[in-house]
């Protein structure tokens, strides 16, 4: 995992037991999973809108910014569920060399 993701995962984990007013992430944890999921949904929509705008303008700066927000809130969700981002990277590694059609068929068969 990249240093950036590792460092972020450590920070997110450290915020779990912090006072709600000590940081944005701590406040999300205290508000609960539904609030985290609400933020994740908002960031998903903002990323989609930024991508549509970038397709017209050719400027992807907002897509990068919104994708960072999306990844960040995805990592907050994973941490809230007791999962580490390495699990996602491991899943992506597992998929290398596996065609998308085969991977989807394997999921459907389960």
Swiss-Prot record:
GO molecular function terms noted in the UniProt entry: ATP binding; phosphoribosyl-ATP diphosphatase activity
SUPFAM superfamilies hit by this protein: all-alpha NTP pyrophosphatases
GO cellular component, as recorded: cytoplasm
InterPro entries per UniProt: HisE, PRib-ATP_PPHydrolase-like
Keyword Glycoprotein attributed: no
Pfam families: PRA-PH (PF01503)
Disulphide bond pairs: none
This protein's pathway: Amino-acid biosynthesis; L-histidine biosynthesis; L-histidine from 5-phospho-alpha-D-ribose 1-diphosphate: step 2/9
Reactions catalysed: 1-(5-phospho-beta-D-ribosyl)-ATP + H2O = 1-(5-phospho-beta-D-ribosyl)-5'-AMP + diphosphate + H(+)
Signal peptide: none
Enzyme type, top EC level: hydrolase
CDD domains named among the record's database cross-references: NTP-PPase_HisIE_like (cd11534)
Annotated compartments: Cytoplasm
E.C. numbers: 3.6.1.31
Keywords, alphabetical: Amino-acid biosynthesis, ATP-binding, Cytoplasm, Histidine biosynthesis, Hydrolase, Nucleotide-binding
Full protein name: Phosphoribosyl-ATP pyrophosphatase
Organism: Pseudomonas savastanoi pv. phaseolicola (strain 1448A / Race 6)
